[in-house]
Amino acid sequence: MNDREHYQACFDLMQAVAAYRHEPIHRRLEKFGKRESMVHLDVLVLTYHLARICRGSILEIGAFRGGTTVAAAWGVRDAREAKKLITIEPGGSLRKHRLATRNILRSLKRNLARKGVTERVTIVEGRSFEPEVVAAVHRALDADQVGLLILDADADCKRDIDRYGPKLIDGCWLIIDDYGGKADNPKVSPTKTQVDELVNSGLLLPLGYYGFGTWVGRWQGITLPRVR
């Protein structure tokens, strides 16, 4: 991709996200996001859009209460072809926050049920790097490959890309949260460092920066050896 094509790809993506402001889905995402999501509305719209248009399955690492999970599920619902949506979430609790919950997994499952997307989502409980979780994801995907990877867990996005990279299709979309943001967010510095290293190595192509600090881009199609 030359510079002009790269610029056009960035512009087309921004234009696509902006166009949803005139669609009913924008209001639905806005209403749901205010109650259940930490990410910016534009990121929810972006997630919906990419889930709707991508080739292949969708893998989300770090669902929390299901803000982006529901956005992706609605995108899958409105897509022309059937797609798998797999989300990894270890659970636990979060206190002293506007989205505080005593039981993250319970809140996630409740939100999926309330929005009518439970049957569209496969939840894998655990941490993305645990061998049994990696194995469960591969079983759920079977022969399918991933066309959209959403990373919003801890700050080690490179570790997750190393583990799941062999399942990414050439040109797979990536949404990586905490690339930027407030100075007191401990996830920002390591996330930005790792993403920039992957961009400089040619593995990732940057296509934008959305919301409060979410990076979006594409996988460059270099197959990594499978991590066992």
Identify the residue ranges that each predicted region occupies.
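Rossmann-like AdoMet
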Residues: 1-37
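S-adenosylmethionine/decaboxylated-SAM
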Residues: 22, 26-33, 45-228
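N-terminal pre-P-loop "Q-motif" helix
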Residues: 38-43
